[in-house]
Amino acid sequence: NGDDVYIWNKGDGSDVIKPGKGTDTLRFGEGIASDDLHFARNNNYLYIYVGSEKDEGVKIENFFYQYDRERETVRFLEFADGTVKDLCAGGFVLEQFFPNTGIEGTDNDDVIYGSSDSDQINGEDGSDIIIGGKGNDILYGGKGDDTYVWNRGDGLDRISDPDGTNSKIVFGENIVFDDLTFMNENDNLHIFLNGDRSQGVVIENYFANSRYRNETLVFADGSSFNLAENGLTLTQTNGDESFKATDFDDVIFAGDGNDEIEAGKGCDILDGGLGNDRLEGGEGDDVYIYKLGGGFDTVYDKQGNDKIAFGEGITLDNLSFTEGNNDLKIVVNGDEGQGLLIKNHNGSGKIEELLFANGSSIGIAEARQLVQAMNAFAPETSSRTDENGSLSVTDDYIGNL
């Protein structure tokens, strides 16, 4: 018991301190400054290394158990130049000296460095700075507004941070926003560097829960991008996927496969790519992209001034229209496997305009007249009926509406 003083000098080796009751001091000898010390945590033990090697320094048993409960332990570090460091006055700069073990911070503001291996780091409470380093790290920020640092070559790190309100992901030198690509996989936001899926950051549960959407991307050139306030350009895989976007203005490239896309509330651009896709624009003024060979897509829309934009090689003359069960079916070049089905076209799901790559367009009123005229109008100069009985209405007829 009592306020004890422990003395450690260069060359003293690796000592273990088992504090009793009292507020204790660890006094370092000549030639040792505060900047010479490295701190590490393993379970509840605090390791203080002098220099970068692990064979010189002090281990304080149960330090963090006492620290977290504001109980007495070794509190002060004294140096020969007269400076004093209070170990309980703030957070720590912690390094990973123990491979294949996790790193935990404190309830104060810590700086935590991972190793070149794949680490698991838990910042606990406090606004921490977490540098995972190389390897595929798992990073938990805990409470507080945390900062995650990622540099080129750092691998693919996973971040879980539901408790912050203004956390940051800071990218290192020579990384700008345009270098990043975004993808939704299993409701996690993947941010890849230059499209390399082994390099970047994964924000877990980003699309599943708004609590996880609190990060701002910060770049070395001073620019930033707030993920909680802006839409994304999502570039998906070529497999069959079911995913959602944000409630902001998104651009979605689904790739190949039979995909199901839920765009949210923003003014979105949805490109289902190849395959038979389900596209749900939601609220907002949405644009659905359809290109030759794009399969047969089903569009579910709700509100807004919405459009279908057809790609190169598709004009109004290539389309045929069929209306039934309150839906509008648009077939391309008479191929029933190519086109779109607009669900609830006569209700909240209507599409207001069709756009073409040649610059022409047709409004919803004209499209509805086309549907109504299909069985009543068949002059050879204005329309033609293909071998399947579907009506393809020409530009000449549109001009006369």
Regions found by a protein language model. Give the residues of each.
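Low-complexity acidic/polar repeat-biased segments
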Residues: 49-101, 192-234, 331-401
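Extended carbohydrate-recognition surfaces in non-catalytic/accessory domains of CAZymes
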Residues: 237
